[in-house]
From Swiss-Prot:
GO terms for cellular component: extracellular region. Expressed by the venom gland. It comes from the Eukaryota. This is Toxin To39. It comes from Tityus obscurus (Amazonian scorpion). Keywords: Secreted, Toxin. The keyword Secreted applies. Its main location: secreted. The keyword Secreted applies.
Length: 10
């Protein structure tokens, strides 16, 4: 779950 960014999941 790399959703620690600003909603950036690619």
């Amino acid at each position: 779950d790399d959703d620690d960014l600003e909603g950036f999941s690619e």
